Amino acid sequence: MNILFGMLHPAFKSLRFDGVWADRFGADEVHCLPQHGFVPDNLRMDRVLRDFGLDAADFFGWFPDLDKLRGSRFGTLSGGERRVVEFYAILCPPCRFVLLDESFAQVMPLHIDTFCKLLEREKRNKGILLTDHRYRQVRAVSDSLCPMSGGTTRPVRRAEELVRWGYVNRSD
């Protein structure tokens, strides 16, 4: 993901949007949710939603249990609560592509279910690259799977390939 944003410079790379080569992508084209939090502790939840141009009513419609924290500073939220706001702030604004790195980390199962519904809604309008260790959830919302190993990715044509390549057990 760092290569896509021009923060890491490999000897060779090929970045394309709909077949058109690009040296790097702009923030208006691609949004990225890093593994670690990015919102400063002193900002309030409602300010973050406003700064990202998001409709607070829509957010709290998806996550009604967080409405009571609307005016809370980010530093007082749990890791999972922070992740919910950051996930929504990156996924939902208009753009062409979204990169989500370990987006389900620290998030309670109820909110992961909501994330999956939001991913289904948003993937109609943009490309989404989702990396996460929660195989079942990733598989449920993915149109295609391309596991990474040793710096390369391979498209999965059949679920049995994931077992053969050692990504999942037969029981999964």
Feature-to-residue mapping (PLM):
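Helix-to-loop junction immediately C-terminal to a conserved catalytic motif
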Residues: 5
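Conserved ABC transporter NBD signature motif
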Residues: 10-26
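Q-loop/switch helix immediately C-terminal to the Walker
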Residues: 32-56
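Conserved ABC ATPase signature
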Residues: 73-77, 81
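Hydrophobic anchor residue at the start of the ABC signature
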Residues: 86-87
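Walker B catalytic motif
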Residues: 102-103
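Conserved beta-strand-loop-alpha-helix hinge in the C-terminal portion
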Residues: 152-172
